[in-house]
């Protein structure tokens, strides 16, 4: 059985669209109808004509698609496609911060659960966090769950950022160290460094550019050779878009287990059996939708 052919057949039969994140396996990227970062995927999810959305990404992304498309069927091909960082932030963390800073707006990275988003004033992605926080009429902002992105936002906006929880992080980006920076410069002396803002502050400081994955794609045209400090599959995406340029992963072991849970086989099974359906309780979805839509409005 040719899985790709079967997926294309079922996709047509179900009137489905496949949305994939930049960190997906190469073969999954190759069959997707749209590939993007969290912000691009959220925007694309507001313009879906299909009846079924198959989300090749982790659970919080599929939840966001469902929140923005309550009347459509949203499928996630694997229950293992979870985000460890999103699960670090509990509602209690937000409520505790609100007790200490009652007037501070709650800004949540989209890498959070739907339940947490219901308590947010606005959501952000790594692509628009600085822009959105700058526009907020407050010098103190509660921000979660990524402490490294919180550091970057504080540096770029000059505002007091309260990270919730205090140690929230992405285990993939947390791996990158100053040793990786030194090694990258030795191995590729002509390359510049593109670094994701989920990396630790010491690594961020060595960047030629700090950008979300969408930002990396936009700015890759500025130089001919890059070392990429983010999930390794981003290198495949960049090489495909810019075949004339050179891209190197800063670490081969920088891979997200949750993202890799999505395969051609389970995308096929997902379309065949219409599983696993993503559901978000109406009250949570209604509140979270406000925060997501406010983000989309503030970052046009």
Swiss-Prot record:
GO terms for cellular component: cytoplasm. It catalyses: iminosuccinate + dihydroxyacetone phosphate = quinolinate + phosphate + 2 H2O + H(+). It is found in: Cytoplasm. Disulfide bonds: none annotated. Keywords: 4Fe-4S, Cytoplasm, Iron, Iron-sulfur, Metal-binding, Pyridine nucleotide biosynthesis, Transferase. Changing residue 23 to F: Loss of activity. Its EC number is 2.5.1.72. Monomer. Homodimer. Catalyzes the condensation of iminoaspartate with dihydroxyacetone phosphate to form quinolinate. This is Quinolinate synthase. It comes from Pyrococcus horikoshii (strain ATCC 700860 / DSM 12428 / JCM 9974 / NBRC 100139 / OT-3). The lineage of its organism: Archaea, Methanobacteriati, Methanobacteriota, Thermococci, Thermococcales.
């Amino acid at each position: 059985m040719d899985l790709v052919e079967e997926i294309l057949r079922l996709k047509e039969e179900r009137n489905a669209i496949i949305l994939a994140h930049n960190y997906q396996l190469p073969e999954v990227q190759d069959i997707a109808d749209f590939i993007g970062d969290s912000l691009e995927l959220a925007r694309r999810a507001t313009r879906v004509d299909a009846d079924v959305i198959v989300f090749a990404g982790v659970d919080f992304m599929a939840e966001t698609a469902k929140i923005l498309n309550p009347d459509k069927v949203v499928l996630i091909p694997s229950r293992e496609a979870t985000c460890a960082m999103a699960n670090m932030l509990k509602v209690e963390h937000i409520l505790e911060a609100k007790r200490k800073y009652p007037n501070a707006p709650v800004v949540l990275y989209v890498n959070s659960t739907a339940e947490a988003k219901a308590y947010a004033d606005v959501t952000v992605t790594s692509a628009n966090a600085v822009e959105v926080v700058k526009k907020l009429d407050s010098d103190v902002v509660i921000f979660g769950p990524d402490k490294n992105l919180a550091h970057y936002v504080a540096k770029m906006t000059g505002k007091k950022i309260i990270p919730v929880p205090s140690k929230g992080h992405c285990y993939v980006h947390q791996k990158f160290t100053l040793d990786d920076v030194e090694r990258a410069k030795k191995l590729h002396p002509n390359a510049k460094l593109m670094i994701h803002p989920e990396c630790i502050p010491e690594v961020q400081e060595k960047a030629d550019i700090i950008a979300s994955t969408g930002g990396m794609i936009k700015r890759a045209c500025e130089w001919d050779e890059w070392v990429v400090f983010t999930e390794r599959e981003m290198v495949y995406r960049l090489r495909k878009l810019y075949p004339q340029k050179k891209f190197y992963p800063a670490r081969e072991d920088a891979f997200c287990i949750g993202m890799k849970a999505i395969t051609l086989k389970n995308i096929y099974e997902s379309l065949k059996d219409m599983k696993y359906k993503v559901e978000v309780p109406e009250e949570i979805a209604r509140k979270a939708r406000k925060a997501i839509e406010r983000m989309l409005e503030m970052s046009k």
